[in-house]
């Protein structure tokens, strides 16, 4: 059994919260660069070019890629042979988010209750997803969920007879309706093992 101190979790989440807002992951950066090279429409090409330029500036200056630094979504794979000591895991993750958003000068936009709209002023609580896996490691990934992208979501009740084709059509229609408005989805450049 491997023992991990909660301080390691806090430090890792703090660092990933900052990195996820400053740097695009390589696969996303490469996909945007490829799209820009292949884009024939000048306006779309210019937009893709600006996204690439913005990501370079953000990385160089160590500033957020986007002003909407989102709600921290934290994905945690916990090995079943891990024992965490020194505190509560959920509290540690939220403390890491709190420290990361403070030290990284990231906008704090999470509210305690959506109806009362009172800001927590530290961007917690994070959305945390746990997955128990074999082994003795903890793997953590942070993905800031920008609220602009959330405003583009839709829901539908499809009939069973719509099948997979109905799902595909709904997704494509949602993308078409949203147009250029949603934010890019990005995550911490690489998940971190602790």
What is each model feature region?
Residues 1-185:
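Non-transmembrane, aqueous-exposed alpha-helical and coiled segments at domain scale
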Residues 186-193:
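Conserved small/polar residues in nucleotide/adenosyl-binding loops
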């Amino acid at each position: 059994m491997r023992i991990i101190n909660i301080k390691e979790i806090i430090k890792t989440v703090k660092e990933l919260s900052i990195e996820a807002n400053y740097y695009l992951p390589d696969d996303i950066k490469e996909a945007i660069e490829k799209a820009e090279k292949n884009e024939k429409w000048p306006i779309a090409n210019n937009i893709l070019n600006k996204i690439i330029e913005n990501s370079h500036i953000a990385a160089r200056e160590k500033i957020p890629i986007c002003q909407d630094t989102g709600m921290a979504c934290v994905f945690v794979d916990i090995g079943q042979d891990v024992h965490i000591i020194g505190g509560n895991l959920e509290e540690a993750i939220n403390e890491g988010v709190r420290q990361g958003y403070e030290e990284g000068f990231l906008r704090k936009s999470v509210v305690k209750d959506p109806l009362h709209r009172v800001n927590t002023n530290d961007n917690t609580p994070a959305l945390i997803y746990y997955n128990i896996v074999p082994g003795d490691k903890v793997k953590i990934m942070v993905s800031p969920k920008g609220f602009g992208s959330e405003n583009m979501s839709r829901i539908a009740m499809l009939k069973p007879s719509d099948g997979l084709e109905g799902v595909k059509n709904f997704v494509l229609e949602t993308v078409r309706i949203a147009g250029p408005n949603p934010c890019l989805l990005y995550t911490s450049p690489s998940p971190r093992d602790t």
